[in-house]
A protein has these predicted regions:
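Multi-pass alpha-helical transmembrane bundle typical of ion/small-solute transporters
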Residues: 1-267
Length: 267
């Protein structure tokens, strides 16, 4: 449930920040009313796109059975992990310049397009993430997942409101840096779940299984161990393949995060 809350909070916050930047720009224009209408038209289009993707995902799933369903579900979990990685890396590189870039692209229909793409992209990613989390939890109750998503949306609204009011206690850079680590932990948990599934189905060799056994000290089926398993991909008795996959994931993520941004031409 915590994973769903964090994902919806972060995704919704990004969309709200984009809308907030555009509203701020619109308020400074001589005729803001038509621009504001275009903005909300774009938001509605983005929400429609996200809803269509959600309906399409479940419609496609209903067409699969047996091995085909296993492939589809595994692909969705891996897609969710990859999208989280992409989102973290993109925001890490572009987040500090987002306000200037958005205002530079703003225009009558440009506002609608930016809003539609922002809301549609974040909404579509959220659909994939929540679907992947539902598979990871092996049938997480719909009510619990919906409640966590609603709480994440409310928290994003509160965070955006605080940011708009210039709350001194809200350090945006620290907030996003912490959320990057949290989201990468969730992505690694999805990757671990996908590796477990692939090994169980015989699609990946386990190599050494288990590579070690920490179940006596911290079992992953209950209490703190279960929380770590759901949130970070911790396994008390991991297969060597899973450990290698996680090491590769974190090595790539840290390398990309630490890599200096490419200088703009002519800078």
């Amino acid at each position: 449930m915590l994973n769903a809350f964090i994902i919806v909070w972060r995704e919704s916050l990004e969309a709200m920040l984009v809308i907030g930047v555009l509203l701020s720009w619109i308020a400074r224009q001589p005729a803001p009313a038509p621009l504001r209408r275009r903005l909300w038209l774009g938001v509605a289009a983005g929400l429609s796109l996200a809803c269509a993707l959600g309906a399409g995902t479940f419609a496609v799933q209903s067409e699969f059975a047996g091995a085909s369903l296993d492939v589809f579900q595994l692909a969705m979990v891996l897609t969710a992990a990859a999208l989280i990685m992409h989102m973290v890396l993109w925001m890490h590189r572009h987040g500090r310049h987002m306000k200037r870039e958005l205002e530079g692209r703003a225009g009558a229909w440009g506002i609608a397009a930016i809003a539609a793409l922002a809301v549609g992209r974040e909404g579509a990613e959220t659909v994939v993430f929540l679907y992947g989390l539902g598979l990871e939890s092996q049938g997480m109750a719909l009510a619990g997942l919906s409640g966590a998503a609603a709480a994440g949306l409310a928290a994003a609204g509160a965070t955006a409101w605080l940011a708009a009011r210039g709350a001194r206690l809200l350090n945006y850079r620290t907030l996003f840096a912490a959320s990057e680590i949290l989201l990468l932990c969730i992505a690694n948990a999805l990757l671990a779940n996908a590796a477990d599934r692939a090994i169980a189905l015989g699609w990946l060799p386990a190599l050494i299984d288990p590579l070690w056994d920490l179940s006596t000290w911290l079992a992953d089926g209950q209490g703190a161990g279960r929380l770590l398993a759901d949130f970070t991909g911790y396994r008390a008795r991991p297969a060597a393949t899973l450990v290698l996959a996680s090491l590769a994931f974190w090595a790539y993520a840290l390398w990309r995060l630490k890599r200096p941004a490419t200088a703009a031409p002519g800078a």
